[in-house]
Amino acid sequence: MDFFILEQRSREEFDMVNDILHHACTGAIIALLFSTPKKTWFYLLLGAAAALLPDVTKELFQDSLLHSLIAAPFAAALFAGILKTIFKKEPFMRIFGSFLAAFVFGHLLLDLIDNGNAIFYPFVKEELEYSIISKSTPLVWIIALAAISAGLAFKRIRLLSAAGILTILLYIGFQAAAKEMVTNALHERYTFPNAAITVFPTGEWPWEAMNWSYHA
């Protein structure tokens, strides 16, 4: 019994670390598209922080407001204004754009395609989801981290960040197509009228044999 408790705890800790890296690395690589050669680390850290912010406030205040698309531009404007007072020479719109992009694409939309998100809170309080990426997969942050590392090493940070983002988008597209194929196959197998079949990813890697599960 102790072994199973320890294993479950280890799994929960892995999932937590994986989730942090999932958002932080994605936010960082998105924000780096806005970077300049002298401000690479500024935008890298800004993007990581922006993408983690919704979960920080959720854990501290048990509130879903910053998981909403509606709150995103206001949060970005607030933090961009604060950062502008510190980094006076940096254009406000560049800070705002990088923060907003990392916030939305590095967290809100990632949540939407893995475990769901109340993306229209407070007008729609239910979590919406289109699960095509398993919460346990490290593939997204591995791609992002590899692209960032290569960009820093070869001093082509924006180019290789764009390449990393394109690779992630191709992976998401592959997962979306795979989900549709599995869903169509299940509808052909279960020919009940108006059958509601929900397909969701379970594997850590897209090449695993048991990568999808479902409930009807």
Residue ranges of predicted features:
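Exposed beta-strand-loop-beta-strand "reactive/processing" segments of non-cytosolic proteins
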Residues: 196-216
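N-terminal membrane-targeting hydrophobic helices
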Residues: 2-199
